[in-house]
């Protein structure tokens, strides 16, 4: 099951879930991509998102406005839907309208092999890595996440040296091996790191839970600001959304 948590009052770009992406609301575009891989449900926090989904025949459920993270919203949706404890759950973002089908499939495969949860990352350049809106991740020898940050990591102390490892940009999608793991993560107390960086995945690392990271090739970009949307619409065309 794929669940897309959709919050109307985003702090950086209010109402972005309903922004038009080549004739479809952003969240609907995301859901149509997800439906190419598995059954998808949008976990809404507002009737306006529900109505937009229903208009385009996208399955949706109404959840609380008071969740601290998209993961918590996914759990409520899973409970409303009555998912079985052993069912895998993918958490895709409602602000990734250009995410390729192959990336979702890669996440699904990684989730099957991950003991706890999985996510994806892609190689980025130095200039991209400077943006705090693009989260960076560093990995251990088994491709498990060591840390996620809005800062540039790993930091290259010797400026004239050549990087030995690529810079990795996190793609904010998650796969949980089963519903019970989703429940386990949400039951953990929030930690100071996730609050400092505003990155919910740091809760798992703080409590020593493994996050397997699948490195993928992707041209997708998350839409965090109005400027992101304007730039994306210049880069992408409707034909590219058929990938």
Curated annotation (Swiss-Prot):
Entry function: Activates KDO (a required 8-carbon sugar) for incorporation into bacterial lipopolysaccharide in Gram-negative bacteria.
CDD domains in the cross-refs: CMP-KDO-Synthetase
UniProtKB keywords: Cytoplasm, Lipopolysaccharide biosynthesis, Nucleotidyltransferase, Transferase
GO biological process entries: CMP-keto-3-deoxy-D-manno-octulosonic acid biosynthetic process; lipopolysaccharide biosynthetic process
Pathway: Nucleotide-sugar biosynthesis; CMP-3-deoxy-D-manno-octulosonate biosynthesis; CMP-3-deoxy-D-manno-octulosonate from 3-deoxy-D-manno-octulosonate and CTP: step 1/1; Bacterial outer membrane biogenesis; lipopolysaccharide biosynthesis
Similarity comment: family membership: Belongs to the KdsB family.
GO molecular function: 3-deoxy-manno-octulosonate cytidylyltransferase activity
Natural source organism: Helicobacter pylori (strain J99 / ATCC 700824)
Xref: Pfam families: CTP_transf_3
InterPro entries named among the record's database cross-references: Cytidylyl_trans, KdsB, Nucleotide-diphossugar_trans
Compartment list: Cytoplasm
Protein name: 3-deoxy-manno-octulosonate cytidylyltransferase
Entry EC no(s): 2.7.7.38
Record's catalysed reaction(s): 3-deoxy-alpha-D-manno-oct-2-ulosonate + CTP = CMP-3-deoxy-beta-D-manno-octulosonate + diphosphate
GO CC terms, sorted: cytosol
């Amino acid at each position: 099951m794929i669940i897309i948590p959709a919050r109307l009052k985003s702090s950086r770009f209010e109402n972005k879930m309903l922004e038009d992406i080549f004739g479809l609301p952003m969240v609907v575009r995301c859901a149509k991509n997800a439906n190419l891989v598995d059954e998808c449900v949008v976990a809404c926090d507002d009737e306006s998102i529900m109505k937009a989904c229903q208009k385009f025949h996208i399955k949706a459920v109404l959840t609380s406005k008071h969740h601290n993270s998209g993961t918590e919203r996914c759990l409520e949706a899973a409970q409303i839907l009555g998912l079985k404890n052993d069912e895998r759950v993918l958490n895709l973002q409602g602000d990734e309208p250009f995410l390729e089908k192959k990336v979702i499939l890669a996440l699904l495969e990684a989730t099957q092999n991950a003991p706890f949860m999985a996510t994806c990352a892609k190689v980025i350049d130095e200039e991209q890595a400077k943006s705090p809106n693009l989260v960076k991740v560093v990995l251990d020898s088994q491709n498990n996440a060591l840390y996620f940050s809005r800062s540039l990591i790993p930091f290259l102390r010797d400026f004239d040296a050549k990087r030995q490892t690529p810079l990795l940009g996190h793609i904010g999608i998650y796969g949980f091996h089963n519903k019970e793991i989703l429940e386990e993560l949400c039951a953990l107390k929030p930690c100071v790191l996730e609050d400092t960086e505003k990155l919910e995945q740091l809760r798992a690392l703080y409590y020593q839970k493994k996050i397997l990271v699948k490195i993928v090739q992707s041209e997708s970009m998350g839409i965090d600001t109005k400027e992101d949307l304007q730039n994306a619409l210049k880069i992408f065309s409707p034909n590219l959304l058929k990938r």
